Amino acid sequence: SQIIHENSLPVGLITATEEQMERVAGELLAITKTVPNFSFQRNTIYLRFCHSDYDKGTALSELCRLEGILKDHVFCAGDHLNDLPMLTLQHAAMLACPSNAIPAVQEAVREAGGHVASLRYADGVAEGILHHGGRAASLS
């Protein structure tokens, strides 16, 4: 593993493989249970340390609060573990993921009544936007 530093402080790490990241994340998960407010966000072989209150979901909700946007008007799409916190009806009313999303993301989107696209990557996100397009337009 390679530790990432900013201003001489460790802020994250990169592993050589996803299997190695699985092991590291498992060890870190145990640490989060004993260290107050410590957490992490990860995506494939990349991991970033963070406060337990910080994730894409809380960031999305705070942005909406600051801008006065109701979650009923929010579309959200993601494909990996770091996206799971925002792919809930707590943060957005319209959820989607591309077909290349990891199984946990596809399951979360389905369980929340969102759209799992038949297309991959950005094309899948565009499909999700079109799927929710009628609803989004009716909210305007």
Regions found by a protein language model. Give the residues of each.
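Mg2+-dependent phosphoryl-transfer enzymes with acidic/Ser/Thr/Gly-rich catalytic loops
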Residues: 49-50, 57-140
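Conserved acidic, metal-coordinating active-site core of Asp-based
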Residues: 1-77, 81-90
